[in-house]
């Protein structure tokens, strides 16, 4: 038999050790859809570059998270500071357990990415690549999210730096991040 409890205010007993706490019996859960249940963040504080025609994991931008319910979602957000050789394109994506979360449709033989950029060369970094995806993994198992990037063949991709990386005040070092939030479903 289902019941409905309608109240305008819930208050703990004044004689309780903590009268502002509502206790829930063991094994039961209060549902609050849309609330953030856990947050994790990884930062890549250094810089490096690579040249490879296939997707590569970005150093330190890997996180694992275990959802508490199959109805919960994972908000994955990446801010990646990247640059490439002049007029060379690069792509960035987030993968869950090795697979791209969302894949663009009708791409033909093009390479799938969540965001892409075109290198400005020398000391001209591109704007940060920002990805924000709401994933619905339907899982309570540990999930591993990674940021990956790749550049056109024979070109170099620079993470948190630029092609010209001399040690002077006119150059900037950046930080790239991956943030995961479990959202109650």
Where are the language model's segments positioned?
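Short intrinsically disordered coil segments
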Residues: 24-26, 57, 164-165
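Local beta-strand/beta-hairpin segments that build beta-sheet-rich folds
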Residues: 37, 57-60, 101-103
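Glycine-rich, low-complexity segments
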Residues: 2-47
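Glycine-centered flexibility motif
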Residues: 2, 12, 27, 34, ...
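Short, surface-exposed loop/turn motifs at beta-strand boundaries within globular domains
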Residues: 3, 35, 56-58, 67-71, ...
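Solvent-exposed, conformationally flexible loop/turn segments
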Residues: 48-58
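Terminal beta-strand-rich extracellular "head" domains
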Residues: 43, 49, 64-142, 146-185
